[in-house]
Amino acid sequence: MIYNKVPKIFFRADGNEKIGLGHITRSSALASTINSDYDCILATRCKISHVLEAISYIYKHIVQLPETDFHSEATRASDIFENADLIILDGYPFDAGYQQELLKQEFDFFSIDDIHASPFFSRIIINHGGGIRPFDYKARPATQFYLGPSYSLLRKPFLDAAKKRRNKVINKNCFVCFGGADPENKTLEILRSDNIREHFEQFHVVTGSAYIYKEELKRFADSKENIFLYSSLSSEEIVSLMKQCCFAICSPSTIVYEYMSVGGIVFLEQIADNQEHVIKYMTGEGLAFLINDIGNIEENSMKLSLEKQSFYFDGRSDERFRKIFRQHFYGKNMVIRRAENMDLQICFNWANDKAVREQSYNQNPIGFDEHTEWFHQKRNDPDSFFYIIEMDGEPIAQVRFQVSGGEAVLGYLADEKIRNKGLGTAILSKGIEKFVNDYRNPIQIVGYVKNSNYPSQHSFEKLAFVKTKSTKYPDSFKYTMYYDN
């Protein structure tokens, strides 16, 4: 498919007083990153008017959806996502059944996730939670994964702040926020704690438009001189407020990624089951501390925390996302087929390319007669699955799987003209998808990559391979994926 028109991308996310606004916030952050190149449309059941008004500038259009069961919604996908080139799903109701219905209707879709609970059928999975590995998911073998804080879903003011981040503690002001809803009113519980209040000079408290305890919170804040309340702030206003506070108490949700982009000492309190993994990861990595640690953190631990935050939150996640979407739509032009006799010469040229030989285990040049014999043998071998990938009618890569004893050894080569464009994962994904569809049996797929071949390692690691040290080849890694249809 060649895109002569601007691709249309639908974002499917909801928000309300019960589930909060995190799904809409992070989906809108992603949409704002790519909307200069794509027509972004939000399909939502959210009915909070000022929330929709605040994000309306991001989307070309907002589609208001009725309340119905999600299975019924999925069966109407062709009406909801009319002429969609891509759908981004962000929410727990968009489970395996919902996704399978989209597959039936031949939609292409990504998932934004944070709990890796149900099976996924998405082309790409984005999870900025940290500590999650591709093989922790039950997904299609060709699914690509973009995981960890390097892929934080942040709005532009927070990305800009990360490039000028705070690197030392200069006050005892505390930023407090538990998301857009805070249904259990954790905000007020924290502020009422004498043990917490005694450690900070000021509290700057932000609540969202879905927060229903505003009057109760205001009555308490009015009784204290050092508690200041804010509601429904813009992202620019939140950044400004965060810059005034060297400490934060918040939930392990989108807000903590935003605060860590500004930089500061974070104390986390879990308010939802899906936050358990994030809180373990962030405290385990020293990025944040538990709320019970308030008053017990040494200065050196705070310094190390700020340093680690600066490593993960570099303000460049928007660049990474734009690259992912460019590669995805570029890759949709790829066509894969079995190798034919006419591919003999191009495969010979690829095999003798200088860069290819340097990363091969046999680095000697290959003669044409030797190559010809090998090529025809592989084409005629029933255990060899030899594919050519084309783009716009031109061969750009070969992917080959050699099956033996329940194992398929994978190898691939790419034409010089497409190297260094980040297409390695797309090529592998295309090849794996074709192979498992052709083979149709349980199989272990294995690839070997030299320690020095960083681009190829990066390509494998965006798929559900397990990485181990190779015992077959020196100075190499072994990548293993088990497929069970």
Go through the PLM ranges and name each one.
Residues 11-21, 26-33, 45-58, 62-140:
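Active-site and donor-binding regions of nucleotide-sugar-utilizing enzymes
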Residues 121-185, 215:
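A nucleotide-sugar donor-handling region in carbohydrate enzymes
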Residues 168-244:
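Donor-nucleotide binding loops and adjacent catalytic segments primarily
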Residues 243-254, 267:
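Acidic donor-binding loop of glycosyltransferase active sites
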Residues 256-301:
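Catalytic binding pocket for nucleotide-activated donors in carbohydrate/polymer assembly enzymes
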Residues 300, 314-333:
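C-terminal alpha-helical cap of glycosyltransferases
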Residues 333-346, 351, 390-485:
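Acyl-donor (CoA/ACP) binding surface of acyl/acetyltransferases
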Residues 375-388, 397:
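A short helix-loop-beta-strand connector motif used in the catalytic cores of GNAT acetyltransferases and
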